[in-house]
Amino acid sequence: MMMSSVAGQRKGPSDKSAAVSEQLIAQITAAVEAGNKNLLRKLGMGSYGILYGAQEKKAMELFDPEDVHNITSLWSSFKKTFTSSRDHGNLFFHLYGVMFFMVPHVHGGEGSVKISLCSSNDPTNPVLQEKVLYFSGGAQAVLMSPTITLPFVKRGPMFYYTMECLGTRAQIPCSVVAIWKQKIDIRSAIYSKQETMSWAIEALHRPQFFQDRQEAAQYISSVYSNATSSATDSVLPFVGAQLGDTKMNVPSEARMIRSSSLRVPMLKVQSKRFSSMEIPSTSTAHLLGTTRDETVIQEESRYEEEGDDGVLFPVKKAQGLNYSHVWDNLGIESFVDVELPENWDELSVRQQVAAAMIAFANKGVCLVPKHIINRDKHNIHLENITEHNYLVILERYGIVNAGSLARTENWYNLTLAQRVEELIYQRDDAYFMFGDNTNPYPPFDCYDGLTLKVRSELERVAKEQARQRFYKEAARAQVKNKVAQTSVEEIPSTSFATKVAMESGSVDSMKIAIQAEAANEAVRPNEVMFEFGQEMNNEGATELELQQPACVASNSFFNVGVFEFAWKKSSSVAAEVLSLALPAALFGKSKEMSMGSQMLRYYDAALIMYKVILYISGMGAISGQLALVWDECNVLNRKKEFINIASLYASKHRLVSASEQSSGEFCFTPTGIGKFVPLDPASGAYDLGSIRVFVTHPLASATELESIPCHIHLQCKVLSTNIMQPPRLRAQAQFGMKPDQTHFPRFPTNQVLLHYNWGVAASMGTTLVSIFSPSGIYESDGTLQPSLLGNIARNCKWWTGTCVFEICIEKTQFHSGSLAIGLGTLNTSMSTPHDILNMPHVICNLEMGRKFYFRCTITNWNGKNLLTTGRKSSLPRPKHMSHMRLFATVLKPLVSTSIHLDTVGVTVQLKCIEDLVLGGTVSVKPIYGHWTKGKNAVDFLFSEMDLSQRKEIEKLRKENVETFDEKGKKQPQVQVPLRDKFSYGAVQYFVMNWKDEERLLVLPCAPWSVRFPQGALVQEAITCPFIDWCSSFCYWSGSLEYTIIVHRVQTSNNIGGVLNITLDSSGYPFPLGISKGTYVVSAGGGAKWAFTYGMSDNIFSFVVHDDEFFPRRHTKARAIDPNASRIMTLQDRLGNLIINLPAKDVISSLEILVKPGPDFKLQLAQAPSANHEKHLGDMQTHTYLYTPDFSELRSFEN
């Protein structure tokens, strides 16, 4: 798919053939990958063959014939799209080489094995290369390469190899492991021996064999080279039957600089059934997070993940030949007058660096690398390294292959930040001293003192400035009139259009400025879509420090409990003998529960590492086996009758024999679906899974013992806790807004959470609780007031940010007392007044002042918070699971020295949200905009029409709601500009059931909507978010993009027609709605669009540009007076859209969608339009007195 540079929308392929080609290419790629995986699954690790003495010659194919047939069939279909020649564009099978490892199993050493690399292209002479390996020589390795390619066609020739044992009577003389590199390409080639040797060294350069290329070269040198050779590690290939007799041009082992990590190559095998045989993981996450007391049980999937083009061991990218950064780092500008070794050109970069430093040292010059001198100034010391971002930091700093870097001796004693720094140091040494570009140096200066966060922000600003310059240049090119080119900045500052100020000479703070265009320095100009205007309240406030309870972690494992069970002799295979749910096992009612488990009750969420040890209390002549299984998500509990040995061994498990009596430590750290695990049983994410014990071999004994006692010792280690646990909700349906996320530097909310009178009669501990949501609704005496964020972000799903709360207490100098304001969740309970100190809180002492504010960054256990508003029928009740709670508790009762001043006013506001990030997408919420006297009995999803047309609406929605790719998840969300997030189409009008004699539709060209009478042929969509946007701002400006969806009558014999749309911006007051007329509308030279509709193309889009007749227009529809001036009818709209509707037997209905244009802007935020309870149904209050029954505060004075 390609992107349009004009509108930023996705466009499909240019024609159907291109789409078919793309689909075939994807199928071919999938078939090749499937063939490689099938081969690996069939052959195991490479090709592992056990040879039997009495067995005849054994042959192994290098590609499965069924996969060959599948790939070639798809390729033949693809070739038909661009050629008719059968032999044009064939595929070729490239075999870079096959490496064989032979391990003898005979003691005397007699006998040999003959290995042959063959091709079926010449049946009479199939052997390409052949080698006889004698068992007396021990374990040996040999490399063979065909140097040619073969056509990859159906029933065509193929590479294979044969193995045959000679001169031995042993039953199993030896075993052979073969690994190879292959590729399927449309080009043919002949490979040189040097390329084959390069692949051989890279194949050996793996954690299972060697750590670096030098080790691989040393191993080859020790086996195949003579003692007098003096070449580099750029060795030539040792291909051919005379491999052992040929003198290889490789460096002598005695003359090479030996690698410090050289070891005997060893192959380790791991499977789920034998978890004790582990291959140490070298992935970045495991390399940084492994501790000595962890037991990791994981499946080795390296062969499937790292493969490229069917390569079992992928070749690394060739390093560049320009190593100027190495010599610049040493400060070497010239090698003049420096005596260098004679074989300088044959040395590796590592050897050249060592030789250069020795040569300069002989001259009395000590070279100290710059990266060593400036190590303390490295930017990595400025980064805030946590367990959530260390992978991103390593990737941005160039660590793409941590497996090529070695662990230090004190690795397990280092913290996470120190491990990251150590990897950076090792990369710098490899890059600057050895010329190794495996982990490339980042493209920025690592010593400029800028962190990654600051650097990203600067890059974003630079890109935005460049884009702004581009837009300005494009705008100048389109303007032909020089007068129109005059910008706002060129108007003199004394002009009334620029600024009108009323100043008072005594008080500077009373200045009132009215500006035509308000500026927000924190937001980039092009991204300004919601311009809130300046705030008038500049009164100072005292900042209160939020007293957040510390997030705790345990230093070591603590005991949770001992859980006993009996292993009976009658228990059959795969029978379950114990089940222990987590984390519910931590909160049992047993008296033996430890203090550590009890302390977790004070926290809402935590990240816990579990350690499980299974003990079998049996001695003597007994046998049997148990399986200790961690069943995440309780998979084994769904169909207990189908559990068998295969399902148990496929799970994460540990086998315990009756003779062992102990399972050892079984450690795991489940996280569920979030970053933390909620400890609230009401959460669906609370149930992580269960520890289960199954019988794999029944209990047997030499005595009449019927059962033996067993017990599980459960220990925990709290890695971190999370205090705030905002609410949870099920995801809602998708419609309209994009799921990407966007950022507001500061979003003014001014949302009232509490407003009441605090009286002297309120005793200590009196608590008010407010249902709190940044997008919620304030209710007072039946009046409902939506919040600004609720109106603007009604289609967003989640938010993160720092909330700034303001507390205003209208008190005098005669009052004293203290009030605590705390933030809690549904899991928060208070039994004493001081329980509020166990949650994030602030304490307002009346002696400190009258106005206070505090900040709190609210983070849910999954890292994001839901945006929630009330439904149209009612506000959520106190037990609703979708809101946080704000508590106001009296710590010190109010004291007044005057009997007439027995109360003080208290107001708690959510002033703004800083660094607000909005993301996700949900279906539309109920509106609180221009509409009043709405329908009480109809749900908001179907309140656009009367009940008789509900089925039609459901049909329209099913046909037009956006669908998602079912093949897999989309790419992870990235932060998009504000305009990209909020520029989406929403249904504004429905038109259906018109008559043939009434086919002239007139609609206002504006973001606000007109409400037509009930039963009219045109109905507005009251769930259009632009209604709420317009009710929250005073003015709008810019262009609008319209989309018209035509619903064609499927039974019509008419194949299509032309849809005419005209923009009338003359100002004449046309009556809105459907009028009589069937003629083709003429634009008279004005803007007009004509779209052809038919069998396939039934969706049309067009843009109505702002003529800038007014700098901005009203967001509220103005009353039209036929006798008034035409200029009055254009103050709220760009004009009227006149649409000539098709005949009703061709088109059944129309959907008209509106979308903000690239320069659309809303200006000067206002209080969102409120509504009354009697028009929207019975409502519940959002403020309650904190009692067990949550008594309503209807009678509380406001």
Swiss-Prot record:
InterPro entries given in the database record: MPV (IPR000603), Viral_coat (IPR029053)
A GO-annotated cellular component: viral capsid
Pfam families: 3A
Record keywords: Capsid protein, Host cell junction, Transport, Viral movement protein, Virion
One GO-annotated biological process of the protein: transport of virus in host, cell to cell
Annotated coiled-coil segments of the chain: none
Domain of life of the native organism: Viruses
Keyword Transport: yes
Gene3D superfamilies (alphabetical): 2.60.120.20
Segments traversing the membrane: none
PTM per Swiss-Prot/TrEMBL: Specific enzymatic cleavages in vivo by the P1 encoded 3C-like protease yield mature proteins.
Role description: Capsid proteins VP35, VP26, and VP23 form a capsid enclosing the viral positive strand RNA genome. Together they form an icosahedral capsid pseudo T=3 with a diameter of approximately 30 nm (Potential).
Protein known as: RNA2 polyprotein
Lineage of the species this protein comes from: Viruses, Riboviria, Orthornavirae, Pisuviricota, Pisoniviricetes
